[in-house]
Regions:
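Short, Lys/Arg-enriched, disordered terminal segments
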Residues: 1-4, 259
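Acyl-donor-binding surface of acyltransferase catalytic domains
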Residues: 3-11, 16, 21-31, 37-107, ...
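Acyl-donor binding region in acyl/amide transferases
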Residues: 5, 14, 24-55, 140-143, ...
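A conserved beta-strand-loop-helix scaffold within acyl/acetyltransferase catalytic domains
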Residues: 6, 64-72, 88-190
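Active-site/acyl-donor-binding loops of N-acyltransferases
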Residues: 67-68, 80-88, 212-259
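Short, low-complexity, polar/charged sequence segments that are solvent-exposed and flexible
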Residues: 102-104, 127-130, 187-189, 197-200, ...
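Glycine-rich loops and low-complexity Gly/Arg-rich segments
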Residues: 108, 132-135, 193-196, 203-206, ...
Length: 259
């Protein structure tokens, strides 16, 4: 590998996710835990603090860290489920090994995050595929100082020849890695760039000795985020207890509730 429309009232709108008011929650959605909706400003932090936030169900979104157990999907309220991969339990599925072999002709460069014109142009192509709640810019997802906030930031740029076709961004703690965001040119979907860059990030995380890789939230209903469950070693957090427990890999096309 070469390393060169929310129908319910909402009180916060965060980058395409609507956070529901408590009154709406109690009348329209029954969940077996206390309603959580927390936001805090981001700043450069020690790796141990970044680890702790991720372990407690926080995720990083632009200039803020957010933590919420309810969102909406297709105008319906649902629960959120923080997920992570315990890297000591991770193994490549046969389809993932096949993808890595298929993409050996791509060139990968990794280094500190730098947002330039090339990545901004790629983001414009990427957001064209988003049909609802289209984000304004990359900084809807990344801090204005993404190379150092909330921690050391690294990017994985994927090229076909000289063309940038995908780029993903991670932030490093002492033991944990946050998969913060990924952009790609939808014209090159045949390379499965979203899954491919996740695999690059996971392999890098293992190489650096990380313990956990955090891809963010999935929903309690089937959604576009279910690809995050397509990995061995996955765990999910219980909002009520804060305890992480293993869950089975959910291959593409399988209902996520079967995992």
């Amino acid at each position: 590998m070469n390393w060169k429309n929310c129908s319910a009232p909402c009180n916060v709108r965060l980058c395409g996710i609507h956070i529901i008011t408590k009154s709406t929650l109690t009348t329209q959605l029954a969940i077996p835990y206390e309603f959580i909706n927390e936001i805090r400003s981001l700043h450069p932090m020690p790796g141990s603090e970044l680890d702790r936030l991720l372990e407690n169900g926080w995720r990083f979104l632009g200039n803020e860290a957010v933590r919420h157990n309810v969102a909406t999907w297709n105008s319906e309220m649902c629960g959120t489920v923080p997920v992570r991969i315990r890297l000591s339990d991770f193994t490549l599925a046969s389809s993932q090994m096949k993808l890595l072999r298929k993409n050996t002709g791509l060139r990968v460069q990794t280094g500190p995050i730098v947002i330039d014109r090339e990545k901004t142009a790629l983001f414009e192509k990427h957001k064209a595929r988003i049909r609802e709640r289209t984000p304004d810019s990359l900084f809807s997802f990344l801090n204005v100082y993404p190379e150092v906030v909330p921690g050391e930031g690294r990017e994985f740029s994927v090229f076909l020849g000289d063309e940038l076709i995908a780029c993903s961004f991670i932030h490093l703690g002492d033991k944990a890695v946050s998969a913060t965001y990924c952009i790609f040119n939808p014209d090159y979907g045949r390379f499965s760039p979203g899954i491919y860059t996740m695999l690059l990030e996971i392999l890098y995380s293992i190489e650096r000795g990380s313990v956990f890789y955090y891809p963010g939230y999935v929903y309690s209903v089937p959604s576009q985020f279910d690809y995050k469950l397509n990995f061995h070693g996955s765990e999910q957090m219980n909002w009520n207890t804060g305890v992480w427990t293993p869950r089975k890999r959910v291959p593409p096309g399988m209902n996520h509730t079967q995992g």
